[in-house]
Amino acid sequence: MSKRILYQEQARRALSQGMDILAEAVAVTLGPKGRNVVLEKKYSCPQIVNDGVTIAKEIDLANHMQNTGVCLIRQAASKTNEVAGDGTTTATVLAHAMIKQGLKYVASGANPMALKTGMSLATQWLVSQIRDLAQPISDHLAIKQVASLSAGNDDQVGEMISQAFEQVGADGVISLEEGKSSQTQLQITQGMRFEKGYISPYFATAGDTVVLDQPYILLTDKKITLVKQDLLPVLTLVSRTNRALLIIADDVEKEALATLILNKLRGIIQVVAVRAPGFGDRKKALLEDMAVLTGGQVITQEAGLSLETITLDLLGEARRIEVGKSYTTIVADSNKQQVKARCEQIKQQWARSDSSYEKQQLQERLAKLSSGVAVIQVGGATEAEMKDKKLRLDDAINATRAAIEEGIVAGGGSTLVHFIKPLIEWSHHLKPEEQLGAQIVAKALSAPLHRIATNAGQNGSLIVEQVQNQPNLGYDAANHRFVNMIEAGIIDPAKVTRCALQNATSIAAMVLTTECMIVDKPSGDK
C-alpha cells in the first residue's frame, strides 16, 4: 500500500487533531459531575460507560493521520491503567494539555529536544514532591473513602471494598462477577491467585482476560508435547460435558499449543493453557495445593498417572477462573475441610523448618491458600447498568490497592494545582529553553481541575485561580464548595497521580519531538 508522508508543523497538526477528538470524548467523564459515554456494540446492546480507558480503546478514526494521534494519546491512558489501574482520564487530560501548550512553543521556534528535557526534569521533581507529600493509609475509613470516590461517590461500594480488603488483606484477591440480582453483594470464598497468565494471547478472544465458568482443571508437572497421547484424551472427555477446561502444565509445546488454539477458535471447547508457577519442588508443592483446592489430582509419573489414561474424576473443578496476561485467579466453592487440613500441614512444615528461605516460601503458600478470594457479585437493574458498575468497581479496587501501596494525596486535581507555583520557582535554575519545557508541565497541571469544574457547570479558570490562591483548600465539585480535601475525604492515591503525570509527560514529549509522520494512504487516493 502506498504511503503519505507529512513533515514538521503539518505532521504535528494532524496528530493534534486526532488527540483533540479522543481527549474531548474521555474528558467529559472526569469528576463527580462527569457525564457518561454511550458505546455502540455490533452484536449486543449499547454500553454506557464512565471509564476513560474503555472509551479510548473504542475510538478508531477513518482519517489515518488523525487516528495516529488517537493511538498515541491512548497509550497514556493504557499505561496508567496497566500500572495504577485508575487515573486514565486524568492522564489523557494532562497529556492533551501538555501537547497543546507545547505545540505553541514549537511553532514559535523553541527547540523540541530542549523542551523534552525540561518536561522530563520537571516531572521528576514533581514525582519526588508527590512521594514526600503522600500520607500512608491503613484504617477502614480512609480505604472506604478512596474506594467510594473512585466508584463515583458510592458509599455502599466503598464500604464493601473496604470489607473485602480487611478479609483478604492488601495483597489478597478480589474478583468481580456479574450477579444474578439487582443488588451488589460481597462473598468470601475459597480461592487462589498465582502470577502466571495464558501461554498464548490467542486464548483471549475478547479483551485481555479470559473467564471460565464451572471449568474442569487439568494439573500436571509434565511438558505437554504429543497431541495424540497427551491432549486428545482430556479434550475428548471434557468436550462431551460441554464445560470449559483450564490446563496448568510445566509447558505446552508448539504443536500441542496450536491444537488447543484451533479447538478454542473453532468453538469445539473453551480451553486455556497456563504454565505452572514456581520451579522444582516448589512447583510440585503449588500444584498439590491447587489440587487440594479444586478437588483434583496432579498427573505425575511418580503417582503412576498418565495423560493417556486420564479420567474425569482426576480433574479439578472450580466455580470460576479468570486468566489474564500475567495472572490466574481460581475461585472454588467446595473442599473447605481439605483446604483447612492442607493449611495445617503447611504450618507444621513451617514450624519444623530451619531455613529462613524455606519458611518464606511456606508462608507465601499458606497466604495464597488460606486468605481465600473476595468475590463481589455486581448487580444492576439492566445489563448496561451492571457493566458500567463493574467497570467502576474495577477502578475502585485498583485505586484502593494503589492507595495502600503508596499513600494518598488531596484529590480533585488540587494537589497538581498547588504545585504550579513551586514548580515555576524550582525551574529558574534550568537553561532558558528547558524552562519552557517545565512551563509546559506547569500550565498543564491545572487541566484536570479545570475540567472537573467545567463538567460541574462552573467556570474552570475561576475555580483554578481560587484553589491556587488557597494552599490548604481544594474544590469539592459534588457540593460546589472549597474545603480541606483530605479532611473532607476527597483523596486520590499518590500512585495514580504519579503514574498519570509520568505517562502524560512521556507521550507529550514524544509528540513534540515528532518531525515526520508516515501513514497509509486511504484507498481511492492517488
From Swiss-Prot:
The keyword Cell division does not apply. Gene3D superfamilies: GroEL, GroEL-like equatorial domain, TCP-1-like chaperonin intermediate domain. The keyword Plastid applies. InterPro entries: Chaperonin_Cpn60_CS, Cpn60/GroEL, Cpn60/GroEL/TCP-1, GroEL-like_apical_dom_sf, GROEL-like_equatorial_sf, TCP-1-like_intermed_sf. ATP binds at residues 29-32, 86-90, 412, 476-478, 492. It is found in: Plastid, Chloroplast. Together with its co-chaperonin GroES, plays an essential role in assisting protein folding. The GroEL-GroES system forms a nano-cage that allows encapsulation of the non-native substrate proteins and provides a physical environment optimized to promote and accelerate protein folding. GO terms for molecular function: ATP binding; ATP-dependent protein folding chaperone; isomerase activity; unfolded protein binding. Belongs to the chaperonin (HSP60) family. GO terms for cellular component: chloroplast. Its EC number is 5.6.1.7. SUPFAM superfamilies: GroEL apical domain-like, GroEL equatorial domain-like, GroEL-intermediate domain like. It catalyses: ATP + H2O + a folded polypeptide = ADP + phosphate + an unfolded polypeptide. Keywords: ATP-binding, Chaperone, Chloroplast, Isomerase, Nucleotide-binding, Plastid. Pfam families: Cpn60_TCP1. Disulfide bonds: none annotated. One of its GO terms (biological process) is protein refolding. This is Chaperonin GroEL, chloroplastic. It comes from the Eukaryota. Forms a cylinder of 14 subunits composed of two heptameric rings stacked back-to-back. Interacts with the co-chaperonin GroES.
